[in-house]
Amino acid sequence: MSSRTLEVHVDCDEGCFELPAWRELFARDAKRHVFASPEWNRVWWEEFGDGKDLLILTLAAADDIVAICPLYRKVEDNKKILRWVGGIDLTDYLGPICDPDDRGEVADRLVEWLGTTDFEWDVFDAHNMPVPFGFTEFLVERADDAGFGFALQQEETAAILRLPSSWDDYLASLDSKARHELKRKRRRIEREHPDTKVRASTKETLDGDLKIFFDMHRGAEGMKGHFMRPEIATFFERVARAFSDIGWLRLDFLEMGDTAVASTFGFELNDTLYLYNSAYEPDLSRLSPGLILVSELVSDSIERGLDVFDFLRGPERYKYQLGAEAIPLNNVQVFKEGTSR
């Protein structure tokens, strides 16, 4: 443990996301989630980094980087807040990029740095940390041992579906009511609209497909319709183009004839399909086009041998109707001054 050294890069710019060690560390773990990729973090920072200070902590053993902690500092209400790069609202999973066996030491070194650094901070506000990864416990324990005040809360849940080997096995895994409803809805749309099909976006169709997705999203009722503000659409577009270039983008449509009636925006890598966002035509809600499209993507994922269908954050009921299990996400706040809460 003592042979490992923590380096802190406080004069970072976008070039820090091109560190070869980051790409190597990301590639080393076949189950690393998409939000740990340098591509995701770079696009997020370039779009939302104004008014923030970027710093990258790297833990090295000899010449080998074993962990990366991408952080930023922002002043809010006269307090200097540290957070994971990726923010709160747009990045579903956050935390250090490291092997699970190194979580304890990463927490050790991170908390040690918080206690000794000249870099000014008041609160380390760590959001969206998946409970199964287990970093939360290490961070809280080390912060408490070091005498820092802290607060721990579950802030949201994600939902994941571990895929079986066949569609029949998948249907059998659902409870009887959910299975009956899914079959009924799929039969109804086939009966009433036999020209219904699923279409995947390609590099050649991406420009037009993004416009279809944005228009459909903005046509939704309530908060969903208001979410796709211009700056959010720009971020989605930049992610789409960056991920399309490396084969990670999944932009899919349910079409009746030549008309799109539902769409999903997601990613695929490491045998996992991530469902990041979706939209459907509200005038056709009776036919559940969004649910039908997602069920088709589940079917396709099973057929192609993927391991996980990750619905990501959000409490939407349909995720659990389709057999997903809840994954709690924790928020830990570490206070430079104050007592434990």
What are these regions (language model features)?
Residues 53-54, 74-154, 270-326:
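Acyl-donor binding region in acyl/amide transferases
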Residues 321, 331-333:
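Short functional hotspots where side chains directly engage DNA or cofactors
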